[in-house]
């Protein structure tokens, strides 16, 4: 590929760059959502997943469940959720770790149009609350519609970047 996932892994600290350095501004907390969000799940219920990420703080976990409309799903196994519900739970787990920067690798993969719109609404709200979000995607329509900036990578190089309107216009 172009190196998108490798770049994201370097930003997250999972890989060491061959050249250069990755630095975060002081106080920033970065978390990454992998392509397979299910790989984050180890507990047998949605509630336990949230509690684990909240450091067993019941109030904090339930507040996140309410915010992400996961309350009706608390007793369900994470693997029994729909694609959109899985993404919401995964993002909730990252936010409970007090992430200020989210790296999302192919977050729309396998989602239907409704789940994509739901995810976009959540991401927009997070941005308004001050969370920075970097998304790697092949979903050009999603990027054009919801991103504030877009970039094109090819063979490990950043070839172009700009606001979606300008980026996709020419």
Pin down the residues of each PLM region.
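Conserved ABC ATPase "signature" region
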Residues: 58-73
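Conserved ABC ATPase signature
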Residues: 77-81, 85
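ABC-family nucleotide-binding domains
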Residues: 112
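H-loop/switch region of ABC-family ATPase nucleotide-binding domains
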Residues: 137-138
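Conserved beta-strand-loop-alpha-helix hinge in the C-terminal portion
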Residues: 157-170
């Amino acid at each position: 590929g172009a190196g998108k996932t490798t770049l994201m892994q370097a930003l997250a600290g999972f890989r060491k760059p061959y050249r250069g350095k990755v630095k975060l501004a002081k106080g920033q907390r970065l978390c990454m959502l992998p392509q397979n969000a299910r790989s984050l799940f180890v507990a047998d219920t949605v509630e336990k997943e949230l509690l684990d990420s909240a450091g067993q703080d019941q109030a904090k976990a339930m507040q996140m469940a309410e915010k992400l409309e996961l309350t009706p799903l608390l007793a369900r196994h994470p693997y029994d959720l729909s694609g959109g519900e899985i993404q919401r739970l995964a993002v909730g787990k990252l936010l409970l770790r007090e992430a200020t920067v989210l790296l999302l690798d192919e977050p729309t993969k396998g989602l239907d149009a409704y789940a994509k719109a739901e995810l976009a609404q959540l991401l927009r709200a997070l941005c308004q609350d001050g969370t920075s979000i970097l998304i790697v995607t092949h979903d050009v329509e999603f990027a054009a519609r919801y991103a504030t900036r877009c970039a094109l990578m090819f063979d490990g190089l950043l070839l172009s970047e700009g606001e979606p309107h300008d980026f996709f216009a020419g």
